[in-house]
Amino acid sequence: MAVTIKDVAAAAGVSPSTVSRTCKDSPSISRDTKERVRRIMAQLGYEPNFEVEPVEAFSKTIGIILPSSQRDVYENAFHLEIIRGIGQFCNQRRYVNTVITGQDDAEVLDAIQSMVANAQADGFILLYSKKDCPVAAYLRNEGLLHVIVGKAAQSANQTIYIDNDNALAGEEAADYLYEMGHRRIAYFGVSNAMLFSAERKRGYQMSLLKHGITPREEDCVEIDTLNDAYEETLKALLTAPDRPTAMLVSDDILAVVLEQFCDKLGLHVPKDLSIVSFNNSLFSRITSPQLTTMDVNPYQLGMEAASQTINHIENPNLLATKIIVPHRLIPRESCCPPPEV
C-alpha cells in the first residue's frame, strides 16, 4: 500500500497540511519542522503528488488573529490601530492580510486550522498574549510562522514578539500618581491571564514598594469580562473609610466604565478619584473628563509586527526577534492632587 500524506503526518507528529506545505518549501514552516518531516518522508519512501497544485497569487497572505470576543474586555480602538499599522505596512510590501476571530478559542482555532489546511496564510500575527493559550500552542507546535503582539507566555526565546515594556509603563503611571501626592493608589484591570495586564499590575506594585508602600490585594480589582460581578467589590473599595484617592486602570475602556461607576456613587473624577489609564485610544478623548493615559503606540506595534512577519517569511532562517516599542504618558483631565495635599 502506498504511503499517504497522513502516514507521514502521524509519524512526524504534525498535521497533513504541514507536510503539504513542507513539500512546497513554504516559508511559514520552521526549518526544524521541515527537516523532521523530510526525514520521515525519506524513511517511509513518501513521494509527494504535485499534479494538482493551486495557482499561487503573487501576493502572500498574513492572518491577523484577534482575541475571542466572548472573553475579551479590552477589544476596542486599540486593536483597530494595530490592524491599521499592519495594513499600512502590508500594502507597502504587496501583502494581503485577513482578520481571524470567533466567539471562543475553539472557534478561532478552527478558523486558523482551516486556513492552514488550505494553505491560505504564509504567516500569522497574534494580537494578544495570555497564559495557557491554545491558539499560541497550536501555532508553536505546528511550527507555523507567527508573531505575537505582547510578550510570549511560553518559549519566549524561540518566539518573535513585539511589545511595550508594560511593567515599566505601569511603574511610571503609578509614580505619576505618587508624585502628585497620592498614597492610597488602587488597581483595576483585566485578568492576570492576559500578560499585558499582569505586567502593568507588577509595575504598579513595584512603584508602591519603591515608595515604601506595601501593595494590598484588596486594593486590586480584576475581571475576565464586563459581565463579571465586579460592581460590589468595586463599590466596597471606593466607599471604604480609607478608600483610594487614585486608581491605575489597565485599559481605557475599563477607565470609562470606572468613571461611570464613580458617577453612580456620587464620586467626582478627579476631585474624589484620580484615574490613569492605558492605550490612549479614542475612548480616552471622548469621555468627560478626558483620561490621563499611557500611550503604547498601537499603530507602531502593528507596523513592527507586519515588518517582522514579512521579514521572516522572506528570510526563514532568521533568529526570533523581539522588539520593544516605547510608551509615553499623556496628561489630561482625570488626575489632580488628593484633597489633603
Predicted regions and their residues:
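Extreme N-terminal segment that seeds HTH/winged-HTH DNA-binding domains in transcriptional regulators
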Residues: M1-A12, P16
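N-terminal helix-turn-helix/winged-helix DNA-binding helices
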Residues: V3, A42-A77
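Hinge/beta->alpha junction and helix N-cap segments in small-molecule ligand-binding domains
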Residues: S68-E81, V99-E107, I162-E172, F188-T233, ...
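Central regulatory/effector-binding core of bacterial HTH transcription factors
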Residues: I83, G87-L126, K130
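Flexible loop/hinge segments that line or gate small-molecule binding clefts
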Residues: L127-A169, T214, I253, N279-L291
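Short acidic capping loops at alpha-helix termini that bridge into adjacent secondary structure
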Residues: R183-R184, P215-D219, V269-S274
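Flexible loop/turn connectors
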Residues: E231-V341
